[in-house]
Regions:
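Short S/T/G/P-rich N-terminal loop/turn motif that feeds into the first structured element of a domain
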Residues: 1-59, 65-71, 75, 98-100
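C-terminal structural segments of small proteins and small subunits
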Residues: 71-91, 95
Length: 100
């Protein structure tokens, strides 16, 4: 918690990726947008083991200075324009979660 504010986290579980190039183009476009809202990547892919639950292909976690900034970033025109590059070839679950 920073100055009494609750951090926000994007947690994305990618279930299907039908075009990796589209996903890479999306990431290249939105990374500067996310960082402009104070987003900091904590996890972007990497080795994992599934212990319970449904299968997924990739996990991404971004930390934001506040929950509100995380929501504001997701709802921004710049982010939505970037997501349009991958949304038709990618299935994911994306949550915004309050944290400490």
């Amino acid at each position: 918690m920073v100055g009494g504010l609750v951090k926000g986290y994007w947690i994305a579980l990618y279930k299907k990726i039908r075009d990796m190039d589209n996903l890479k183009n999306y990431a290249a476009k939105v990374t500067p947008v996310i960082k402009s809202y104070g987003g900091k990547p904590l996890v972007r892919g990497g080795k994992f083991i599934k212990l319970e639950g449904d299968d997924f292909k990739r996990l991404v976690v971004w930390e934001f200075p506040t929950y509100e900034k995380a929501v504001e970033c997701h709802n921004s025109k710049e982010y939505k324009d970037g997501w349009s590059l991958a949304k038709d070839t990618t299935e994911r679950n994306l949550q915004i979660v309050e944290g400490t």
